[in-house]
Curated annotation (Swiss-Prot):
UniProt function note: Required for ciliogenesis.
Entry keyword Ligase: no
Molecular function as annotated in GO: phosphatidylinositol-3-phosphate binding
Name of this chain's protein: BBSome complex member BBS5
Gene: bbs5
Length: 342
C-alpha cells in the first residue's frame, strides 16, 4: 500500500501553470476562502486574478487566462509578511509577501488586493497558514512528544480513540520496551509504561504499510512509514496471536477509511462560506497553440527570491517595449519572461 503522503503534493510543493484537474481539491482538502480582484504583483503585475485559500495551499489564477496560475503549499512557506509594493492596478500599496522554498529553490510571491480597504487578503492567508503550522501532529511522525498525560492520550481537536491495547512491546531496542497502544481515527500512538516521554506518534498520513512479519522476538506488527519521512520501520510485539491479528486488521481498516478522506487538522472558519472550488475555477479553453510538455522554459524565474534586493532597480528604456522598465537582473531577457512554462 502507498501512503497518502507519497501521493500528496498540494501542501508540499510550489507549482506553476497547473492543469484544471490539479486546481481541484483533493480528498480532505477544503476551500476556506476565495478572494477576487487579487493581483500577482511579482509575476503578473497588472493582471487581475483570483486567490483561493484551502487548508493545504493557496492558488492564484488569472481571470483573463486561467491557465496562467500558481499553487503554493503551506509546507513550503518560510515567511509571510506585509510590505509596500508597486502595483500597476493600485500603484504603491500594502501587499502580502510570501517567501517559500521548494526543491532547494526559493521563490517569492507578492499579492495585492486591487479593491482598497479590505484586509481579508492578509487575515485569511496568515491565519490559515498559522492553523496549518500548529496542527503538524496530524501530519508528522513525532518521537518523544508531549503526547501522554496521566496515562491518557492528549487528544487532538478532531481525534477519537477507537482502541487502547495494553502489553505492547516496542522492538526498537535489544530487550524491547513494554508499553501501551492508542489507536485513533488519525494516528497510532505508543508510549512506554515506565517512561511516558518515551513515545511515538504515527499519523495514518505517514503510514506506507502495516503487516505481520517475523522478528527475533517472534511474529510482530511492523509499520513502515512513507518515503518522505525516510521510510522508518517500527516493530511492535503483541501477544497472543489473535490479539495481534485483530490489531493489524483494525489499524488497516482505519487507515483505509482515513486514506479515502484524510483529516489534515487545519481548522479555520470563515463567516461567509465560499463557493465550491469546482464552481470557481474557470474551465480552460483549448487554444490553437500546442505546448510541448517536455520543453522547459524559465518563466517561473520571475518568482525567484532576490535576497540582495533592497530597492527597485534603476529604470531603463526598452526599445522592445517602447517604454521605461526596471532594469532586468543579469542573465534575464524580456523574451524569457514572456514565455509560458510548458
Amino acid at each position: 500500500m502507498a501512503s497518502v503522503l507519497d501521493a500528496l503534493w498540494e501542501d508540499r510543493d510550489v507549482r506553476f501553470d497547473i492543469t484544471a484537474q490539479q486546481m481541484k481539491t483533493r480528498p480532505g482538502e477544503a476551500l476556506i476562502d476565495c478572494l477576487d480582484s487579487i493581483e500577482d504583483t511579482k509575476g503578473n503585475n497588472g493582471d487581475r486574478g483570483r486567490l483561493l485559500v484551502t487548508n493545504l495551499r493557496i492558488i492564484w489564477h488569472s481571470l483573463a487566462l486561467p491557465r496562467v496560475n500558481l499553487s503554493v503549499g503551506y509546507n513550503c512557506i518560510i515567511n509571510i509578511t506585509t510590505r509596500t509594493a508597486n502595483s500597476k492596478l493600485r500603484g504603491q500599496t500594502e501587499a502580502l509577501y510570501i517567501l517559500t522554498k521548494s526543491n532547494n529553490t526559493r521563490f517569492e510571491f507578492i499579492f495585492t488586493n486591487v479593491v482598497p480597504g479590505s484586509p481579508r487578503l492578509f487575515t485569511s492567508v496568515i491565519a490559515v497558514h498559522r492553523a496549518y503550522e500548529t496542527s503538524k501532529m496530524y501530519r508528522d511522525l513525532k518521537l518523544r512528544g508531549a503526547l501522554i498525560q496521566n496515562k491518557q492520550l492528549r487528544l487532538l481537536p478532531q481525534e477519537q480513540v477507537y482502541d487502547k491495547i495494553n502489553g505492547v512491546w516496542n522492538l526498537s531496542s535489544d530487550q524491547g520496551n513494554l508499553g501501551t497502544f492508542f489507536i485513533t481515527n488519525v494516528r497510532i500512538v505508543w508510549h512506554a509504561n515506565m517512561n511516558e516521554s518515551f513515545n511515538v506518534s504515527i499519523p495514518y498520513l505517514q503510514i506506507r504499510s502495516i503487516r505481520i512479519r517475523d522478528s527475533k522476538f517472534g511474529l510482530a506488527l511492523v509499520i513502515e512509514s512513507s518515503q518522505q519521512t525516510g521510510g522508518y520501520v517500527l516493530g511492535f510485539k503483541i501477544d497472543p496471536m489473535d490479539k495481534l491479528q485483530d490489531a493489524v486488521k483494525e489499524i488497516n481498516s482505519l487507515h483505509k477509511v482515513y486514506s479515502a478522506n484524510p483529516i489534515f487538522g487545519v481548522e479555520y472558519e470563515m463567516e461567509e462560506k465560499p463557493q465550491p472550488l469546482e464552481e470557481l475555477t474557470v474551465e480552460q479553453p483549448p487554444d490553437d497553440v500546442e505546448i510541448e510538455p517536455d520543453e522547459h522554459t524559465d518563466a517561473f524565474t520571475a518568482y525567484f527570491a532576490d535576497g540582495n534586493k533592497q530597492h527597485d532597480r534603476e529604470p531603463v528604456f526598452s526599445e522592445e517595449l517602447g517604454l521605461a522598465i526596471e532594469k532586468l537582473k543579469d542573465g534575464f531577457t524580456l523574451q524569457g519572461l514572456w514565455e509560458v512554462m510548458g
